[in-house]
Amino acid sequence: MAVVNKIGKIRKRNHALVAFDQDRIVRVILRASTSVGGFEQDYLPGINDRIFAAGETDEGIAQFLSDLVVVCLNADERHHVSNFPPTVEEIQNVVLHVLSSNGFTKVADTYTCFRWGHHWVREGAIPEAQFVRNGYPPEQMEPWVAWNREHDCDTVEGLNDIVRGGRLARLVSDSLERYEASLDEAARKVVARIEKGDQLKMIWVSGPSSSGKTTTTVKLTQRLEKAGLRFLMLNLDDYFWSLIEHPTDWIDDRNFETPEALDIQLMNEHLRALLEGKAIEKPVYSFKEGRRSALKPVCREKDQILLLDCLHGFYPPITAGIDPKVIFRVYIEAMNPLYEPNPMMPLYHGDRSDRRLTRFEDVRLLRRMLRDVNHRNHPPLATLLHWHYVRAGELFSIIPLKGMADCVLNGGMPFDLPALKPFFIGDDGIWPTVGDLKAYPSFLDAQIRHRRVTHLLDSVQGLTLAQTRDLSLIPGDAVVREFIGGSTISIPHNE
């Protein structure tokens, strides 16, 4: 695509003016694409197939997208004046807009993770060694991919064969054995830190929404209590700002997914006070009233460890001023690697594989939707339309910071999708219809996600509802029970 570039300079973060280099935009887009297996991961007929046809190769597509970035930058006439060039952040925002608005959501998410990871390195929140690039380092993912391959559940077809062949019980047992072993290892690491002489006073269990933090926190606590440790647990949801202080968007939704939805300053003050042996007056939040309704005195006994289950537990301002040596961080995310067939891509001549990885966040969306319907009285469509806030929050201050973790756990299981599917299909299924989305034609994120998850649900062999209630098949302490019901573990947010 022939584009006349009208941008002469850009303003760097140190306010220096340097020449605008479109090739740099091509390189960063291509790098984000390459790190997730190429643009083919985002091929969507009817949305971006013409870009694939125009670009033909990954390099050509990156060039085409960079041209669109230039078109957007040219549209702001201020940038034509040498004293008012676009800033680095403005250019990054435009790159993200171009990727997202043309359906390249996986590349956009990867670009966002790179962007904020670099931000946290620049801020000194993490060293370069903790920069996790696209959020899923190969050395972390390869063992899980290998495990699924060994158990013939790394592909949709293989998983379906297991379900149809009546062999799911063995897969459930093996998967939970692996998960429990990872919890044993996490507990050993905590004890080892203490035996080494570290004065641990705080344990965080953090990770993206609906990853299984609550079940994991309970199970880890049980192990550590057997080792003689004592805990003080705080409900950090009590630190939400009052509802009136959360602005609404054009569909009357609120962004509760950003760390700044919490009173970070007060939380930090209280955590520091508790670690110093001081008593605090902790707020008690009434979700029914949408405000803080009371204060509760809390103090930490000298031998108690603060145990905190929070989405944003790694967000640096929360623990500002607290010695890292007293903190142990556990990161959990549902990351079950499952591959599906790649669709045909006419006119695209880039390297392409036969399969592509399903999205981890799509399984978490199903988990959250089911929880929201059953325990929060939220309609399924509202959860789908809200999910862009969830992704923005976790790509800013959760996934890019996972390198801070002392231990990384996988809350995703190969049997999750078969267990979740029966709640979303049929006459009583809660999955929104295409018609439900017609009133929101501008919500491309929701439209794309709906199409992708619908295809995934159609392709996976599900259990029956009766099978999902069978505790001999899926035990009551399995993570997925947080969402499908039948959990034998007390789940505060489900009460």
Regions found by a protein language model. Name each.
Residues 1-135:
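Long, C-terminal-biased catalytic regions of enzyme "large/alpha" subunits
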Residues 212:
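Conserved glycine(s) of the Walker
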